[in-house]
Amino acid sequence: MAIGGGGGGGSWSIHGRPDVTSRYEVLGRAGSGAYADVYRGRRRSDGAPVALKEVHDAVSARREADALLAAAPSRHVVALLDHFPGGDHDDDVLVLEWLPLDLSAVVRAAAAARPSALPAAQRKRWMLQVLEGVAACHSAGVVHRDLKPANLLISEDGVLKVADLGQARILQETGTYQGMHPYEQSSGVEPWVSQQRAVLHGVKENHPSHDSETQTGQEPERLTAADYLHEMDQLRAKSTHGDVDKMSLQDGNASCLATCSTADIDDDPFRASYSYDAEEGMLEEESGAFTSCVGTRWFRAPELLYGSTNYGQEVDLWSLGCILAELFNLEPIFPGTSDIDQIGRIISVLGNITEETFPGCSNLPDYNKIFFNKVEKPIGLEACLPDRSASEVSIIKRLLCYDPTKRASAADLLNDPYFAEEPLPVPIEGLQVPESKDEDDDSTEEWANFRGGDSDSDFDEFGSMDVTKTDKGFSIRFS
């Protein structure tokens, strides 16, 4: 079971909660993460199996509970059965229906069974269930923000349900995110452009519309890659001693590259997801701006990779496209080893991100900080989906497009002609469901072959690098 949540801490043990144990028997640990622990349990009143999710961050727990209640009742969204709020010394405990499998188990089982793989009729039923779950969330105004196969749980009889909504947000009925598309507002400054101080690697950034070169008339200072990495080392050293303003780095208007790049350089690039902690969640609550550092890299929309903090359900639709493509290929379509590599992989397939392909992209916080050589001949989605029919490629194209306003909704895709073609989707009871995974199963090693070599740095992924230092920070061009 996928683990969500943020930072914080309480007892870190469900066994010391008589309010919980008096109503639920704790049978054993089912999964564990930095910010949540999940236990198998049984309801004492009727013996029904349950999942007891102990969340070590009250903000994340409340957010998940609110999102689940907003989307209920839905056959394809996990049911929240009970909620035990935490206190000064206890964590929140969410009681959820027990679902022993997830969609990544289906993908792994099908990949192991090659060449028979996943029959088309079964694949269509899995796809329809994913679409129904996402459509239910979106109709309730919920943005999941971390859709991936591991967060799509499956019952033993094959019913798939959207789960792990610890990063979810509920869009307001009025205001920025509801009833007015964030990319279509007509104010002088695009809504995702930060009006407050942002930070790129600890360097203050001016408003994007004020070009430092134009203001000063001076050529920017040129840096070698070694100079750039030396500056990064100095910033890390300052950060260690608390000299970098942590609140600035965690501000809701700071971009994902601004807050995450040094970690990509420093740490294991296979660490696919950015840790969404409690402090970041509280800052979102206070500022009203979303953070761009949500979701898991392989499924993160381009606007998030470029630092957007004002977005809607369209980010889920990009993730949905990646998930459905994985059901076709039985492997991730964009398995980036770092955020920069992720953008590079997407561009190599879909082409250059420009105002023509993504209106308003030049206003994204990091658009003018990371540059790639122009791709003259992108390989296209057809090449990434070999031996697939036109209708199969079409459904992925409707989701994996740069312009968020052109991504098809999950509700629309439920009526896509592809699902009316032969072979028709099998009924749910006709699905071949893998055996339940062991408690200690760790799927990370299953995907180890998708690592980008042995590199542990964004910069090792590219041949040459042109680094420019300006008053805004660093501008990097990769070739």
Curated annotation (Swiss-Prot):
Catalytic site: 146
Swiss-Prot/TrEMBL keywords: ATP-binding, Kinase, Nucleotide-binding, Phosphoprotein, Serine/threonine-protein kinase, Transferase
E.C. number: 2.7.11.22, 2.7.11.23
Domain Protein kinase: 24-419
Biased composition (Basic and acidic residues): 468-479
Swiss-Prot/TrEMBL catalytic activity: L-seryl-[protein] + ATP = O-phospho-L-seryl-[protein] + ADP + H(+); L-threonyl-[protein] + ATP = O-phospho-L-threonyl-[protein] + ADP + H(+); [DNA-directed RNA polymerase] + ATP = phospho-[DNA-directed RNA polymerase] + ADP + H(+)
Residues found modified as Phosphothreonine: 291
Amino acids binding ATP: 30-38, 53
Region (Disordered): 429-479
Single GO MF descriptor: protein serine kinase activity
Induction trigger: By auxin. Down-regulated by cytokinin.
Record GO cellular component, one term: nucleus
Top EC category: transferase
Family: Belongs to the protein kinase superfamily. CMGC Ser/Thr protein kinase family. CDC2/CDKX subfamily.
Protein name as annotated: Cyclin-dependent kinase F-1
Organism encoding this protein: Oryza sativa subsp. japonica (Rice)
Phylogenetic placement of the source organism: Eukaryota, Viridiplantae, Streptophyta, Embryophyta, Tracheophyta
